[in-house]
UniProtKB/Swiss-Prot annotation:
GO terms for biological process: translation. GO terms for molecular function: structural constituent of ribosome. SUPFAM superfamilies: Ribosomal protein S2. It comes from the Bacteria. The gene is rpsB. This is Small ribosomal subunit protein uS2. GO terms for cellular component: cytosolic small ribosomal subunit. Keywords: Ribonucleoprotein, Ribosomal protein. It comes from Bartonella henselae (strain ATCC 49882 / DSM 28221 / CCUG 30454 / Houston 1). Belongs to the universal ribosomal protein uS2 family. It holds the Pfam family Ribosomal_S2. NCBIfam families: rpsB_bact. PANTHER family: 30S RIBOSOMAL PROTEIN S2 PROKARYOTIC AND ORGANELLAR, SMALL RIBOSOMAL SUBUNIT PROTEIN US2M. InterPro entries: Ribosomal_uS2, Ribosomal_uS2_bac/mit/plastid, Ribosomal_uS2_CS, Ribosomal_uS2_flav_dom_sf. CDD domains: RPS2 (cd01425).
Amino acid sequence: MALPDFTMHQLLEAGVHFGHQTHRWNPKMTPYIYGQRNNIHIIDLAQTVPLLHQALKLVSDTVARGGRILFVGTKRQASDIIADAANRSAQYYVNARWLGGMLTNWKTISNSIQRLRKLDKILAAEAQGFTKKERLNLERDREKLNRALGGIKDMGSVPDLIFIIDTNKENIAIQEAKRLGIPVIAIIDTNCDPDNVDHPIPGNDDASRAISLYCDLFARAALDGIARQQGAMGIDLGAQADAPVDPVLENTAPVSE
């Protein structure tokens, strides 16, 4: 059993250290900013590394106790990656528009999920007894529901822990989690408010390579938790070749308070 391994070199290669343009920053991110280069804030990866490791351990521990992890990322570049990571690790996801009340009005959401299940059953039987037009309408309804709720169809209840890409875009999800006392792990870019989440991880939340790296690590942490829960042997997920060191940090000016 082992948590997924990663190196600072991998974070650099994925562009995790690149923040937003300096004029688009949130001053609350000052403690997590190493400096700036060409009017771009550079994130302090020396802080990202331990915070990411702690978050991975939390995911593994939560799953090992039988808890459910909800992956949330509805922006275009995160959508497919989020779904793949959740599916690969037997967890749950929201990768289309977050529907208000997805957590705080779970009863209503559950009714919609039951409707989705019913449509699945009807269409699996080739919608016998329905006209062609009625079948098309049923298929459209199912597609719409599946896009919104397919990733949480089997969740059964609200999650025990939420992992979020882009706290600005997913603010409603964060507020609902707060109301229910559900802890939130989130990637916080230099334009985000780190105070909004329980477990902030400073990092680029826009680059596909960075998002892929985060999601892969968290999926593997969840799988480690499943292995621990089942009492199985873990798989050594380290032993990856170091990526070249990005020279950007050598030419970075310190950020002013």
